Amino acid sequence: AAFALPAFASFEKDVITPAALEAVLNRKAPLSNIMMENDAILNVIANVKTVISNPVLEEALLKTNHGVNGIPCGESCVWIPCLTSTVGCSCKSKVCYRNSLDN
């Protein structure tokens, strides 16, 4: 049987890669007055996003052919907005992207 990647919408939760998680943890939200510990942040993220490996997400992005939207941030946004918005990502076509022209 052939291995097929599920569509983003077939996941029960949105997905995020370990690299995207690290970027979120390393960046403090500008409007946050409460400094949460990394463990607490990870618990919150685990309730709303499923952590998947980078190659799985990259393969899914290649199959959807939405490369013109920018640089993938390693996160989907089917149900939950981009957590990586703190590092400049935004939701386009159910995937969080960073504008390739921004530094």
From Swiss-Prot:
This is a cyclic peptide. This is Cyclotide vibi-I. InterPro entries: Cyclotide (IPR005535), Cyclotide_bracelet_CS (IPR012323), Cyclotide_sf (IPR036146). Residues 10-69, 100-103 form a propeptide. Probably participates in a plant defense mechanism. Disulfide bonds join 73-89, 77-91, 82-96. There is a cross-link at residues 70-99 (Cyclopeptide (Gly-Asn)). Keywords: Disulfide bond, Knottin, Plant defense, Signal. Pfam families: Cyclotide (PF03784). It comes from the Eukaryota. Belongs to the cyclotide family. Bracelet subfamily. GO terms for biological process: defense response. Residues 1-9 form the signal peptide. The presence of a 'disulfide through disulfide knot' structurally defines this protein as a knottin. Coiled coil: none annotated.
